């Protein structure tokens, strides 16, 4: 599990011209710690950017791309001065594994807890997640996904912090749906 996390960039600095927090996946864990870490507990640290990049890699057949904060630079009359080209960062997993995970993510939106992220007429791939954050009974609620699943145009990650489980899942999937609809003009 640690090697897979590293393959998706956990514990590595993102080389982008912006200060961002580094995600981490602990090493040298006991079996019980590894079990907790495998579902995002124990001492796993991540950011919405890292989670969105992971979903984007699944959408892209296992290839993770370097994130860009802007697509192009335009002049005052809106002609393109410079356009950034997509740049491969790493191969995170095989196409076979990425395709299987994609199928599971589509099923999670079509038939599972992530159904709130569904967009009419669009096949959406997504996954919810809940991270316990202490003894308060509150959690961090996540949704990540991409759409359209068969020809991805957008990959996202949404997190609501310090929230109860049922409210968090509803809010995070609804926010995902709204992002998909806005970008895909639905």
Question: Across the structure, where does each feature detected by a protein language model lie?
Answer:
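A short acidic/glycine-rich loop-to-helix N-cap element
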Residues: 160-174
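Short, well-ordered alpha-helical segments
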Residues: 95, 99, 170-177
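Beta-lactam-recognizing serine transpeptidase/beta-lactamase-like catalytic domain environment
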Residues: 1-160
